[in-house]
Amino acid sequence: MRPMRIFLNDDRHVMAKHSVVYPTQEELEAVQNMVSHTERALKAVSDWIDQQEKDCSGEQEQPEPEEPETTEEGKDSEGKTGENPTRTLRGVMRVGLVAKGLLLKGDLDLELVLLCRDKPTISLLKRVADNLVLQFETVSEDKYEVIQNIREASIVIKNTKEPPLTLNIRLTSPLVREEMEKLSAGETLTVSDPPDVLDRHKCLAALASLRHAKWFQARANGLKSCVIVIRVLRDLCTRVPTWEPLRGWPLELLCEKAIGTANRPMGAGEALRRVLECLSSGILMPDGPGLYDPCEKEASDALEHLERQQREDITQSAQHALRLAAFGQLHKVLGMDPLPTKIPKKTKVETPTIDYTVQIPPSTTYAMPALKRPMEEDGEDKSPSKKKKKIQKKDEKSEPPQAMNALMRLNQLKPGLQYKLISQTGPVHAPIFTMSVEVDEKTFEASGPSKKTAKLHVAVKVLQDMGLPTGMEEKEEATDESEQKPVVQTPAQPADSTQTDSAADQAESAKQQGPILTKHGKNPVMELNEKRRGLKYELISETGGSHDKRFVMEVEVDGVKFQGSGSNKKVAKAYAALAALEKLFPDYTTYAEAPKKKRPPMMPRGGPKFAGKHNQGFGMMYNEVPPPQAMRGRGRGGMNRGRGRGRGGFGGGNHGGYMNSGGYGGGYGGNYNYQTSATAGYSDFFTDCYGYHDFASA
């Protein structure tokens, strides 16, 4: 749906401001490099800790060699314990601005959460930090400084180059929250904590940030303009001190609720105004409705940290901003100069190529393994589809223009030709059209599965009669080569280079000439299936890149194997079937090309509207004598020709009809129901450890 015209000017201002505060490509690359290097180093630390624990457990079990025999089940269990899914370091997750894609220009603080199997301790933190220094040297050439912050239960990592980024790794465990829930329920704890356990409140805050990141990715990332509006409002919170207390999780919740409850997608300007309207309504006031936190089990207000004066100031500022926007002065709210009213004609800017929703790929962090693929050296972090489009554009520029097909060539030589439809035969699901054209007092006819294909075949015949190239020569040469080599090939025998060249020519000619058909206008696979039932096509090879695949299919007919290749399996099967047909059945004829005889007129089904659409001989009893009038009633329940839903079929027996009793019996909707699923939607509550990376599966 197009945005309302009244908000177009607001959209321009919001998007212009967003492009100013959006981080540069160099900043995003630096963030991506630092985060991916840290994740890989933590994966190596986890492997190192598990190996040490495995060695220690092996030394303890060594003095017990009195087991008589080890069965296969015992060996399997040992193998499983070697890669125990409950590792000491269970996974690392991106949280905060990196996970939500809310980074602005100048944001230098990044966050990760490291989940542990047990409650994190000071000794574990020191152990991870010490080994992390060694792992950074093997993972990357960049230099990083590792600092232990025991008071904050985190490890701080700083890079040594511009921009000076700081990555905060917070240690936590789901056991911390489980213990808090048991205590609140009045249960007694049987397990005592280690003496050097880290601060419980810091661990709970890390778990909360993990829930917030998962909720944001599930609810806010899919809303149009939501992420853009949050970035613009984050900049407003930085510029205007009044808005500073709203920054962070409360602002994200407000924007999602205001934009997500709209009945249609909104542009950036309209979405920003809707958020301002929500704040102006008094939602922040002490006697207001408040803001429910969906990531907590118990009902809690996400705005409880705001003081009364702060709530009033933010509400008053939002009302003032809404008045400015209503009078066309949104640029004052955004802190920018007004844009010209007339949009310049030349607006070719590179900004549309930027995916503003996703900053640091991959965006769905929790659906990906913990070990990220390192970024390429040249810094190309664009999506594969854009790379593919670039490659295609380069190929189009470098290659000469494609040759005209036969129809275009004939229209260029003889403009104004009139193509006529002679006949239409075959069943409804696979009709065969016969077209004709008169050129120089000669009439040419050809058939095909569609009028366009039949016209193309007619043009080929005309050009062949005139002695001109048709563009089909490459295809004919390729089929000749397949006729000369139908012999059984051993699997070890490599494919000929000429064969692959001919396959490429076949695929290229197929693109230019339309669908692959036999000389009777049928699909080769379907026609070969009529001759030999139950044939099996096997995939011999698959070569080429993702944008230029080559498939080779093989079929065995009467003990002889035939191969065909194409850009997909369907085309390769068609060429294999075509080679078999032209080799084994060179002189066969089909029913569609039987001698045309003038038959007595048959009363068409359904009146003259459906005349000529059904051949009398396709599996039906045909009688030249028209049925009696009593058998041809057209009303509901009219003898055997009733046409109502659920009535008897079209007249059967020897009266040339279809015995399809039952009509549309049953109606619609009887079998169309959607199964409910536990994962069909997003719950309002998110647990702590669902969906995190497991180091063991990485």
Swiss-Prot record:
Lineage: Eukaryota, Metazoa, Chordata, Craniata, Vertebrata
Organism this protein belongs to: Xenopus tropicalis (Western clawed frog)
Motif Bipartite nuclear localization signal boundaries: 372-390
Highest taxon in the source lineage: Eukaryota
Signal peptide: none
Keywords annotated in UniProt: Antiviral defense, Cytoplasm, Developmental protein, DNA-binding, Methylation, Nucleus, Phosphoprotein, Repeat, RNA-binding, Transcription, Transcription regulation
Record localization: Nucleus; Cytoplasm
Positions with biased composition (Polar residues): 490-503
Protein name: Interleukin enhancer-binding factor 3
Principal location listed in the UniProt entry: nucleus
Example GO BP: spliceosome-depend formation of circular RNA
Compositionally biased residues, Acidic residues: 61-71
PTM description: Phosphorylated. Phosphorylation affects nuclear translocation. Methylated by protein arginine N-methyltransferase 1 (prmt1b) in the RGG-rich domain. Methylation decreases DNA-binding and thereby decreases transcription of the gata2 gene, but does not regulate dsRNA binding or subcellular localization.
GO cellular component: cytoplasm; nucleus; ribonucleoprotein complex
Region described as Disordered: 51-88, 374-403, 473-522
Subunit comment: A component of a ybx2/frgy2-containing mRNA-ribonucleoprotein (mRNP) complex. Also a component of the CCAAT box transcription factor (CBTF) complex.
Gene3D superfamilies linked: 1.10.1410.40, 3.30.160.20, Beta Polymerase, domain 2 (3.30.460.10)
Biased amino acid composition, Basic and acidic residues: 72-81, 374-384
Functional description taken from the UniProt entry: RNA-binding protein that plays an essential role in the biogenesis of circular RNAs (circRNAs) which are produced by back-splicing circularization of pre-mRNAs. Within the nucleus, promotes circRNAs processing by stabilizing the regulatory elements residing in the flanking introns of the circularized exons. Plays thereby a role in the back-splicing of a subset of circRNAs. As a consequence, participates in a wide range of transcriptional and post-transcriptional processes. Binds to poly-U elements and AU-rich elements (AREs) in the 3'-UTR of target mRNAs.
Span of domain DZF: 5-379
PANTHER family cross-referenced by the UniProt entry: INTERLEUKIN ENHANCER-BINDING FACTOR 3, ZINC FINGER RNA-BINDING PROTEIN
Pfam families: dsrm, DZF_C, DZF_N
MF term (GO), any: sequence-specific DNA binding
Domain DRBM residues, every copy: 399-468, 520-586
